[in-house]
């Protein structure tokens, strides 16, 4: 068993690596223009080129993939020559600083030909002092310096250059300035170290936003899962044991009806009844990302929508599997030998009949976490699926790639759990 689990884990890790390449390539090739989404539809080619350069989006695809997966701080540290430190402010924004030997943190800015150091003291106060002593000389006599700027980038400045760049000035928007950096390296630790970057849409760390959205989806999916799965399995087994009876026909027809109704139609129908006509429940989540914790009653309609849809599908799969097992020769042989009915059913039939539903259930765990985007949009629920949809529409590359990889991790993880459960449900299965 241990060898099987280790082998499966290695295979799943290789799968995730290959899928990460596919996710990156598909996201990069998706339609949309990041610069136009951020700067506006009237952006000029010069502004777009400067913006992409500052975000590192004009780098070759292999370099961008490497930075997204394992980060860029290790590369920037060699250029800056100082350790780099990542801070998250009280408002949730990310700041990168270079660490001085004395313990202070520093960033730089260029004012004409004067290099200004912004030194952050341990108490949080920031002091600006001239720091021209850090200019380095090349063989041709030109002066240059690699440092960290206030926009969380490692930048290369050259003294005396008149390079033009478009920068964001608070209160004024994007403005053209002279003396821009010659090269930019946006700083992040990478997906594998829990820092896929900053959202282009919100300016906040993607990891923190994903954690909140994933937590909200887990709440919704967990409640729906806890309600649906025991009920669907019990009803499916009961229907399968009474094939052709009134109970079987009623459950089969009801399950088919609920499973074919589109998610948006089911959600709107429940909103009309319980929110508009009866006024018992709120029809939408109208608060922020922490709404599920502030108003638990807002979970009722989304959970009920998922429950009705999932109940019908899992019930039908369980019923079909139970009917097939009860018709098997070894079940008939057990009855002929005189074994008690309950022993045949619960020790032999049910265990084998659960193999197909377990596969479906594990697949639906992925759907409950990230595939219920329609339900989340209908109810305005701040979950992972809605976050991925908003990121895709905006082409928020960092958020979209990280969210997609979270779904991949969940998918391969649930598949591993399903494979392990098979060995307990069916002793005929042997893994070597």
Where are these regions (language model features)?
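An internal, D/E-rich "acidic patch" concept
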Residues: 60-229
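Phosphate/oxyanion-binding loops and surfaces in catalytic or ligand/nucleic-acid-binding neighborhoods
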Residues: 24, 58, 72-79, 264, ...
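C-terminal TM-helix exit segments that contain a strictly Trp-centered aromatic cap at the helix terminus
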Residues: 267-275
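Hydrophobic alpha-helical transmembrane segments
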Residues: 149-173, 201-204, 209, 245-256, ...
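Alpha-helical transmembrane segments of integral membrane proteins
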Residues: 2-3, 214-247, 260-263, 275-432
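Hydrophobic alpha-helical segments of integral membrane proteins
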Residues: 9, 47, 51, 55, ...
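N-terminal signal-anchor/first transmembrane alpha helix
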Residues: 1-60, 108, 113-157, 211-212, ...
